[in-house]
């Protein structure tokens, strides 16, 4: 019997296949691929471009303005959808493909599914070397796209039309598997995109990818319950895996039943809203005082869906030497970290099974959880009301800029606004269900400490790769994923704005309103803090011109040129007025805030291991190195 076939080009088959991919979670099924971002060039416009023009199916097509920017929008879409829906990205060959590589790293580090479709050189090699092709004397097979191999969870090349079938099936298995979720890259030779093949019709049947919740073994659950009951001061670290598992109700139930405090990673923050009594906020290098105090007292840490990055563990100094660990994770590899007791399973499913086993158990924290939270809220209130003065101002980041330098910034930027006051003002003024997006600089620290999410899944921080430029481009993806009237706020510094804001124009083009909160302190403030804290002088991290004058940039005018509604706000009153007016707008807005350097929040009970120079002529650097060696003695080695 001859199998029924349909004759399609490789690109047409790709688009047809994408339209038939569904994901089912807890009995609910929906299309997995909602659309595709494209930036057409000679490598994809007559192949994938033609296929999308002819019959896109349900796929929504968005025109990106920069390959990395549109890819970050696609990544943010998947993140905001809790990895249950994605966008693909199609680019031309050469530099267009290369621009995706950084974004692939972002998706990889954050375990976020996205399908990358970079065009490749000719499979036939007839016109070689084609425009934008690299020529390696050692191998003709090497192309720009080999750079994706280090940053893809799945990587493949399609040089014949029939290869597409196995490549796509494998890619979707990886993207829809919670253990391996991340970027899948399929490089398609540009001549192959247009080549036809008789594809079996069965390949295009509706295909449902089932996201089954893995339940731990009875042994794992029983032993985990024993460890918890034997502890006096256990603490739960809520990681991104808990959020992607939709484990909010189960976390609250366990925490309330057993009086176990919750602390959060960036990826886990807003899984449970901050108003929950046992939620002490972010932990680690960027954590709250309350969370870091409680984690230092833990005799057992229960990590739920966390990778234990250095920012979560304070470079492995956050825990007492005797602290034990239980790691609950779908990834067996992640459960092995810190010599933990391993519980391999879905966060939600695991907590459903574990909670009944802990009935009657209570921790020994007593009123410490509420006391630490009250102390922290008092500290947050102090940070909300920091005021600059020209005589003896003590910024949060101390002993770096003297009063003369701070006055110079105040005069040059025409502001006395502190970063912490500005950020908390935004938190207090926006609608409770607003989504906040950020990624790099000092602002993630302020957000992790000071931003109190009132509604679950509204805190959107890319801190796996902490990629500058994600903030605005990612905000577009978050907006595309949000409910119709849900506002999205991009929290971005001037450094990240300069790095990339390409999809600001795309947001205006497609009527996807985002609100850009631009904090301008005229420099790379976060790294300047790190530099000076470790003994160096301020060196090429401030934005100063050839005459050593602080640069003054009108970022509002840049956004206005694109067509955004813009505001300038260097006081709390002006900021509140701008925020209220921005709510009334139907298109993208930007609020340009000049804030003083060194007025971001400082760390609490933390340490970050960075590569301080062992040898230097500067005494301050030598002291910093000696301090590092002292802290290393307190750190776990693995």
Curated annotation (Swiss-Prot):
Thiamine diphosphate binds at residue 67. Binds 1 Mg(2+) ion per subunit. Binds 1 thiamine pyrophosphate per subunit. Its EC number is 3.7.1.22. One of its GO terms (molecular function) is 3D-(3,5/4)-trihydroxycyclohexane-1,2-dione hydrolase activity. Pathway: Polyol metabolism; myo-inositol degradation into acetyl-CoA; acetyl-CoA from myo-inositol: step 3/7. It catalyses: 3D-3,5/4-trihydroxycyclohexane-1,2-dione + H2O = 5-deoxy-D-glucuronate + H(+). Mg(2+) binds at residues 494, 521. It comes from the Bacteria. GO terms for biological process: inositol catabolic process; isoleucine biosynthetic process; L-valine biosynthetic process. SUPFAM superfamilies: DHS-like NAD/FAD-binding domain (SSF52467), Thiamin diphosphate-binding fold (THDP-binding) (SSF52518). One of its GO terms (cellular component) is acetolactate synthase complex. Its cofactor is Mg(2+); thiamine diphosphate. Belongs to the TPP enzyme family. This is 3D-(3,5/4)-trihydroxycyclohexane-1,2-dione hydrolase. It comes from Listeria innocua serovar 6a (strain ATCC BAA-680 / CLIP 11262).
């Amino acid at each position: 019997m001859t199998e029924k076939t349909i004759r399609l080009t490789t690109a047409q088959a790709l688009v047809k296949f994408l339209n038939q991919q569904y994901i089912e979670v807890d009995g609910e099924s929906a299309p997995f691929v909602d659309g595709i971002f494209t930036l057409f060039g000679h490598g994809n416009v007559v192949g994938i471009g033609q296929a999308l023009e002819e019959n896109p199916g349900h796929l929504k097509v968005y025109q990106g303005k920069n390959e990395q920017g549109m890819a970050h929008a696609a990544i943010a879409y998947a993140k905001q959808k809790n990895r249950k829906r994605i966008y693909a990205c199609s680019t031309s060959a050469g530099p267009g493909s290369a621009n995706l590589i950084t974004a692939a790293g972002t998706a990889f580090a954050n375990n976020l599914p996205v399908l990358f479709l970079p065009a490749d050189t000719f499979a036939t090699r007839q016109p070689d070397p084609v425009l934008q092709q690299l020529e390696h004397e050692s191998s003709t097979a090497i192309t720009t796209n080999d750079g994706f191999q280090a940053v893809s969870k799945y990587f493949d090349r399609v040089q014949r039309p029939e290869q597409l079938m196995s490549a796509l099936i494998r890619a979707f298995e990886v993207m829809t598997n919670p253990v391996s979720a991340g970027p899948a890259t399929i490089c398609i030779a540009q001549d192959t995109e247009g080549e036809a093949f008789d594809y079996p019709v069965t390949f295009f049947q509706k295909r449902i990818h089932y996201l089954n919740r893995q339940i731990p073994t009875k042994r794992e659950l029983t032993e985990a319950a024993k460890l918890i009951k034997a502890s006096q001061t256990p603490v739960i670290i809520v990681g991104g895996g808990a959020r992607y598992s939709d484990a909010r109700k189960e976390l609250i139930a366990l925490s309330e039943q057993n009086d176990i405090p919750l602390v959060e990673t960036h990826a886990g923050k807003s899984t449970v809203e901050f108003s929950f009594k046992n939620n002490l906020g972010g932990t680690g290098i960027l954590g709250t005082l309350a969370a870091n105090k409680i984690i230092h007292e833990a005799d057992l840490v229960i990590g739920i869906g966390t990778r234990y990055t250095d920012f979560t563990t304070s470079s492995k100094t956050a825990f007492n030497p005797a602290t034990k660990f239980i790691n609950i994770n779908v990834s067996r590899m992640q459960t092995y970290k810190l010599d933990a007791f391993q519980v391999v399973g879905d966060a939600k499913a695991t907590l459903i099974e574990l909670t009944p086993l802990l009935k009657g158990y209570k921790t020994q924290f007593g009123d410490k959880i509420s006391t630490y939270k009250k102390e922290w809220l008092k500290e947050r209130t102090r940070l909300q009301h920091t005021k600059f003065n020209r005589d003896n101002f003590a910024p949060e980041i101390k002993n770096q800029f003297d009063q003369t330098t701070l006055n110079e910034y105040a005069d040059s930027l025409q502001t006395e606004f502190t970063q912490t006051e500005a950020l908390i003002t935004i938190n207090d003024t926006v609608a409770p269900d607003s989504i906040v997006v950020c990624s790099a600089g000092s602002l993630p620290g302020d957000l992790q400490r000071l931003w109190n999410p009132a509604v679950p899944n509204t805190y959107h921080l890319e801190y796996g790769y902490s990629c500058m430029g994600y903030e605005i481009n990612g905000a577009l993806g978050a907006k595309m994923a949000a409910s119709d009237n849900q506002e999205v706020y991009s929290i971005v510094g001037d450094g990240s704005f300069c790095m990339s804001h390409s999809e600001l124009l795309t947001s205006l083009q497609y009527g996807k309103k985002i609100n850009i909160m631009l904090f301008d302190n005229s420099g790379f403030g976060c790294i300047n803090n790190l530099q000076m804290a470790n003994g160096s002088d301020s060196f090429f991290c401030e934005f100063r011109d050839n005459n050593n004058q602080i640069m003054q940039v009108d970022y509002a005018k840049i956004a206005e040129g694109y067509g955004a509604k813009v505001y300038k706000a260097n006081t709390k009153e002006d900021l509140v007025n701008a925020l209220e007016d921005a709510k009334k707008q139907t298109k993208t807005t930007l609020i340009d805030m000049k804030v003083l350097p060194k007025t971001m929040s400082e760390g609490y009970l933390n340490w970050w291991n960075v590569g301080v120079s062992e040898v230097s002529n500067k005494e301050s650097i030598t002291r910093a190195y000696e301090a590092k060696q002292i802290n290393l003695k307190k750190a776990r080695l693995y």
